[in-house]
Structure formats: C-alpha cells, structure tokens
C-alpha cells in the first residue's frame, strides 16, 4: 500500500513538473514571436547564422579553382570573382531557406565539415588587411565615390531599389589604379578652353572634307547615268528614223496608242489651263480687281440705255400728244411745236428707238403705235405739269425708273394716281374717239360749254386741277369738264364733284355698250324730234337700275344724287340749241367704244399678271 501511494505521488509531481515546463515553453515561444513581429531585423540576424547557399557555392568554387591551379600551374586562369569573401545576397529570405534545405540534403556531413575547415584555413593564411589609404578600390563602397563620378564615367545609374539588395564582390588589386579619385579629379579639372574649341572646329572641318569626295562621286555617277540614258534615246531615235525610211514614214507605235497619247496630252493641257485660269481668277478676286470694270461698264450702259429710252419715249409722246390734241399754242411753245412738226426725226432718235425695241423685244411698229396711243411701257409715269415740248432730247427730264411701287396694285392708273375702289379712270382711247364723242352719244354735248360754278377762288381751282389725271393721247380741252350737273348740292359735293362727272360719263358709256337696246337703230343718227314721255320713263328706270347695281347698296347718297341727275337730264331730251341739225355718232363710233373697252380689259389683265410676277419675285 505504501509503495502504491509513493508511486502515485511521484507521478503527480512529474505531471505538475511537465505542465510547468510546457507552459514556460509556450510563453517563451510567444514572447519570441512577438519580438520577431516587432523587430524583423532580429529574425534576419538569426536566419543569417545558418550557412547560405551562396556561401556554399563560393566555397565550392574556391576549391575547384585550387584544384585547377595544382593541375595547370604554367597557365593559371584568373577569374575576377576568385577573391570573393563576402556572400552575395540576391534573393529573398524564403528562397534562401528553401535553397539551404536542398543543399543540406545534397551534401553529407563529412563534406560540410571539410568545406568549413578549408575556408577557415584560408582565412588564417591570408595576410592582414592593408590600411585604409592603401585599400583597393571596392565597388560596393558607395561612400568612396563622389556624387558626380557616375556622370563623369557615363556609367548606367542603378536604381536605388536594386542597390539595396545587391552587393558587388571585391576585385583584385590593380597597380595602375592606386588612387580611386585620380581619374575623376582629372575630368573635373578639365574644362573647355578657346584652344580646345578651335581644335574641335578644325576636326569638324576635316570631317566635312572627308565626306565631300563621296558626294562628288555620287554626282558623277548620276551624270554618267543621265548621259547613258540620253545616248539610248538618241539610238532609239535613229532606229525610228531608219524604220520610217524603210516602212514609209510610219512610227513603230500603232495609231490607237498615238490617239490615246494625244488625248491624254490634250486632257492634261486643258486641266493645266483651267487650273492656271482658276489661280489667276482667285488672285484677281483677292486683289479686288476682277470683274469690277466690266460690271461698272454694264451698269453704266444699262443706266444710259434706260435714260435714253425714257427721254425718247417722253419726247415722242409729247410730240404725239401735241399733234393729236389740235390745240392752238401761242408764244414760244407754239413756235417750238411748229418747229418740231416741220423738223423730221434725226438719225440718233431713230437709232435709239431701234435699240429700245431690241432690248424690250418689241417690234418697232408696235412701239410706234404704243407711243401714238399714249401707252407707257415699263410703267413710266408722266408728270402732271403742263406740256412743254423740248427742242432736243437732252432737255427732256429723266423719268423715274427706280420707283419700287410701280406695280404695287392693279388699281394704279396710267397717270400714276391710285384708283379709288369701284371707280374707273378714263384711259387711252382709240384714235378718233374722245370723251366728247361719248357725251355726244349720250346726248350731253351741251354740258361741255358750261362754266363751273364751283371753285370760288383760284387756289381751289388749281388744287382740283392737280387732282385730275391726265389722259394720254388727248388734249386738256377734250377732257371731262369740271361742271355741276346739280346746282342745289354744290355746297356739299364740291370736293369730289369733278371726279364723279368723269366716272358717270365713263360708266354711261359702258352701260351703252352693255345694253345696246337703249339705243335704237334710228337713234344712231338722230335728228331732233319729239320723244314720248313713256319711252323716257322706261330709259330712266333702266339707267337707275344699272347704276344701283354698279354702286351697290352701301352708297345711298350717291344713288339719290344720280337719281336726281337721271330725272333732270333724260337720255333723249338733251339737245344742242345752236346746232339742231347735227348728226350723231354712227356704228363706227360704237365699234370704237367696244374696242376701247376690250383694250381696257386686256390692260387690267396685264396689270394683274405684272402684279403676280412682282409678288413672285
């Protein structure tokens, strides 16, 4: 029993002792791991205590060299890395440990011991190191180099990252290079002087002289080649001449090739000419001299032509109006008109007429008829002042050709005055037909000789005369007289009575043509005879109805006034007391009226087309 208890106590004590040992070992390992994590240099020092694979390789290399030295003493082969005594560390720690384990497995313990002993003996046999002044130049000592030596030797600068992990082995001592700073001092002291610069210039000149003959040789070769090609061309030409003599003047190349070459040459020439012309035109445009004289000449010619046309047209129209009016001119105007009638047209005016007809594309006969009829081509406006015939064409004032509102609307009259809506102006009548003839057809010829009770003073009379349009092709004596048909309304209707007289005469002429039943066959050549009152009433009613249709429902005052006019002046009752046996217009006069109305409709159509053309432009 006692032995068993003692055995148990001993086992317990051993267990307790083992537990303490295990806990202490774990604590020590824990502390060591913490220290290694905090201080990695300590880990590197502990790792470097083991023999590195580089050291092993170096020792093996030394041993091989010694063996070769014993074998070949006559021709020793020195290697710059024979004096390596410091191990090279080029890889990381993981690779080092891996290589160490592999080298351990490869070498046995006896080999290890032999290598280590030989290395120790070699270290003991080496002489003591020389002082620092006589120390050989080592590449791994970066402090020995000045900062500018790599630039002086033009060596490759190693990056800082590689220099930290790489160490170069020591070299053998060289007798020629005892002082490592000797060469660098020479380079630093050496500077460029004027003499050195002069020598450099002379060297460059010599180099240029050396390169010169080669260029001359090349030029000579090129010239020889050109001469050779020229000789070949000459031979080819002589062969062609000989062949032409034999064949009969034909070239070697066929006709198709000749044609192709000719066409190609022509195309090239044309392209070159066009390009040259374009360049010249561009240069002229840039300089601002292209086309300016031509355009100015064209504009001047057009302006001169328009001025001449306006002068000739106004001159001839005045001449025709003066001849057709038949009025007696007294004073200087009468003498001038007589001279114009006696004097024929000169060659210059005829030439101008031909030029106008050619530019306007109007036959000369039509142009003369238009001038006689009083029409105005190109919308020329006649002035309102009294006619004064000029002796020469240069005395005629210029026409207003630059008016943009010439074809502004179809309501513009020939005299340049706007037509009121619903009012027709008396325009160019056919030859031999005047307003007086129309009034004679209506039986109102006695109104011409009456005097106007309006216009109390001369100013108002002149003002009213300025408002009246001038009808070309007839004199002012043949125009509609400014008289009052209704004396009891002169105070209210004086401002526009003159226009109403003209409108009424024109409208009655139109109604006469539109309703031919108003004029019986026996009334075309009327003799004063009593007319029944029933016929008068019927004619008055028809005229009133036609006037109402023309004026419309809005103008009641004008309808009342025209009703009074129709009552006061019946169609068949007005007679001329002085000439009771006067004959009136016949069928020819009626045909002239119809021709005038057709002409007016055609002119309205032309104005409408001109307006449409101007709007489209």
Swiss-Prot record:
The keyword Amino-acid biosynthesis does not apply. GO terms for biological process: angiogenesis; eosinophil chemotaxis; induction of positive chemotaxis; intracellular signal transduction; MAPK cascade; negative regulation of endothelial cell apoptotic process; negative regulation of extrinsic apoptotic signaling pathway; positive chemotaxis. One of its GO terms (molecular function) is cytokine activity. Its main location: secreted. GO terms for cellular component: dense core granule; extracellular space; neuronal dense core vesicle. Keywords: Calcium, Cleavage on pair of basic residues, Phosphoprotein, Secreted, Signal, Sulfation. Pfam families: Granin. The modification Sulfotyrosine is found at residue 153. The modification Phosphoserine is found at residues 176, 270, 434, 532, 555-556. Residues 261-286, 295-307 have a biased composition (Basic and acidic residues). The keyword Lyase does not apply. Residues 261-307 are annotated as: Disordered. Residues 1-30 form the signal peptide. It is found in: Secreted. Interacts with Secretogranin III/SCG3. Binds calcium with a low-affinity. PANTHER family: SECRETOGRANIN II (PTHR15119), SECRETOGRANIN-2 (PTHR15119:SF0). Belongs to the chromogranin/secretogranin protein family. Neuroendocrine protein of the granin family that regulates the biogenesis of secretory granules. This is Secretogranin-2. It comes from Mus musculus (Mouse). The lineage of its organism: Eukaryota, Metazoa, Chordata, Craniata, Vertebrata.
């Amino acid at each position: 029993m006692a032995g068993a208890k003692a055995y148990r106590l001993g086992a317990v004590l051993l267990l307790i002792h083992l537990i303490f040992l295990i806990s202490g070992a774990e604590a020590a390992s824990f502390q060591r791991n913490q220290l290694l994590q905090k201080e990695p240099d300590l880990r590197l020092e502990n790792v470097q205590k083991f023999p590195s694979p580089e050291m092993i390789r170096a020792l093996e290399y030394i041993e091989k060299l010694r063996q070769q030295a014993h074998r070949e003493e006559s021709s020793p082969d020195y290697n710059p890395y024979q004096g390596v005594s410091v191990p090279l560390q080029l890889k990381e720690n993981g690779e080092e440990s891996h290589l160490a384990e592999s080298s351990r497995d490869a070498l046995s313990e006896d080999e290890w011991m032999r290598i280590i002993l030989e290395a120790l003996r070699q270290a003991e046999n080496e002489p003591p190191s020389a002082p620092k002044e006589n120390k050989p130049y080592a590449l791994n000592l970066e402090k020995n180099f000045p900062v500018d030596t790599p630039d002086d030797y033009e060596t490759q600068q190693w990056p800082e990252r590689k220099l930290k992990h790489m160490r170069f082995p020591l070299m053998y001592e060289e007798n020629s290079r005892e002082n490592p700073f000797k060469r660098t001092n020479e380079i630093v002291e050496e500077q460029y002087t004027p003499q050195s610069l002069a020598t450099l210039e002379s060297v460059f000149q010599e180099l240029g002289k050396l390169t010169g003959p080669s260029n001359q040789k090349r030029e000579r070769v090129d010239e020889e080649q050109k001469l050779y090609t020229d000789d070949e061309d000459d031979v080819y030409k002589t062969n062609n001449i000989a062949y032409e003599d034999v064949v009969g003047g034909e070239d070697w190349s066929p006709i198709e090739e000749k044609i192709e070459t000719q066409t190609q040459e022509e195309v090239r020439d044309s392209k070159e000419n066009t390009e040259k012309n374009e360049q010249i035109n561009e240069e002229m445009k840039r300089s601002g001299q292209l086309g300016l004289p031509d355009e100015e000449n064209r504009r001047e010619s057009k302006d001169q032509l328009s001025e001449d046309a306006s002068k000739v047209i106004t001159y001839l129209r005045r001449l025709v109006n003066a001849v057709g009016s038949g009025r007696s001119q007294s004073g200087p105007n009468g003498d001038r008109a007589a001279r114009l009638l006696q004097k024929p047209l000169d060659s210059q005016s005829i030439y101008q007429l031909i030029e106008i007809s050619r530019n306007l594309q109007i036959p000369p006969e039509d142009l003369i008829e238009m001038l006689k009829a009083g029409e105005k081509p190109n919308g020329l406006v006649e002035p309102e002042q009294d006619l004064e015939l000029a002796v020469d064409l240069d005395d005629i004032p210029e026409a207003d050709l630059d008016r943009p509102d010439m074809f502004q609307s179809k309501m513009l009259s020939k005299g340049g005055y706007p037509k009121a809506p619903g009012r027709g102006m008396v325009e160019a009548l056919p030859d031999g037909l005047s307003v007086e003839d129309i009034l004679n057809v209506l039986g109102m010829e006695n109104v011409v000789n009456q005097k106007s009770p309006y216009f109390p003073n001369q100013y108002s009379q002149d003002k009213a005369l300025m408002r009246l349009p001038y009808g070309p092709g007839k004199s002012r004596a043949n125009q509609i007289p400014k008289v009052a048909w209704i004396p009891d309304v002169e105070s209210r209707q004086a401002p526009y009575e003159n226009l109403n007289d003209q409108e009424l005469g024109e409208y009655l002429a139109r109604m006469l043509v539109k309703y031919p039943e108003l004029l019986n066959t026996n009334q075309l050549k009327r003799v004063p005879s009593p007319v029944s009152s029933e016929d008068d009433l019927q004619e008055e009613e028809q005229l009133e109805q036609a006037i109402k249709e023309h004026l419309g429902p809005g103008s009641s005052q004008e309808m009342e006034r025209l009703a009074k006019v129709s009552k006061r002046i019946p169609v068949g009752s007005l007679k001329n007391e002085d000439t009771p046996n006067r004959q009136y217009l016949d069928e020819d006069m009626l045909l002239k009226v119809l021709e005038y109305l057709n002409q007016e409709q055609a002119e309205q159509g032309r104005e409408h087309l001109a307006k449409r053309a101007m709007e489209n432009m």
